[in-house]
């Protein structure tokens, strides 16, 4: 079992830390009070099965190992409709 340090802000912001880095294996490492979420592993944005960043405005950002990456669609989907494709950060 992993022993995380969980920090909770007065505004409801929650973050999970391991060895001084944002890190969580079984869910988002950051949950914002506005509903946004961010997944981290070893201090880098990372999520295999969905966007690593989900913003409260509906924008989504897909990362693997800290780099924009998505094989089956745009790695960035902005709430204004803009879309950007990346593989391994390029």
Where are the model-predicted features located?
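Glycine/tyrosine- and acidic-biased, solvent-exposed loop/turn segments at the edges of beta-strands
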Residues: 1-90
